[in-house]
Amino acid sequence: MSSWTVKLREFGLSKLPPEQLLPDSQPAYMTSAVYLFGALTIGSLVVLLLSGTILALKGPTWWHVQSLGHFFNSIHLWAVELFFFFMVCHLWGKYWMAAWRGGRARGLMSGAVCFLVAIPCAFTGYLSQQNFDSQWIATQGKDGLNSLGVGAFFNPLNFGQMYSYHLLLLPLAVVALVGGHILLVRRHGIVPPIPLSEGDSTRPA
């Protein structure tokens, strides 16, 4: 009788074989620039996580008093800006390419959900600055959030809560969604361009 570990391994191999998880070649159409936005989004996320980790280790006030801290804070900010820019370009590019074709709908939806989760992650980052800017954002945002009924468990005026959300909970959710998104892409393959004619060889099976 096989154990649960064997069943789990067999299930994983059946859904995502190693040669599919880590391929050594890609279709020729992947050389198009529109396919680069996904990789650029992941690259921005890596820089974002590394700079954020350094800022977290030094504490929330470090960047106010040290030039090196201000440097890493600037790196973190621009990584966020590029992350959202590349992700929006990636989402729009895949939407106009009809990336839900060939059973890829879950991959497209996971990317869209990741974008939605990244918004409050960035919002809590602005609330964690510990300056007048973060205070103004918190006071202006609380009324809108209270009107939505989330103020009881998500209080922008509570720095500790917002810092915890920004440092741990929301980044974990974003990384998990990105990881799931990559696995779905590996499983189904990257979406081919929309065929120009009925006999086009790029038509998915």
Q: Each predicted region: which residue ranges?
A:
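Membrane-embedded alpha-helical bundles that constitute the cytochrome b-like, heme-associated redox core
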Residues: 1-205
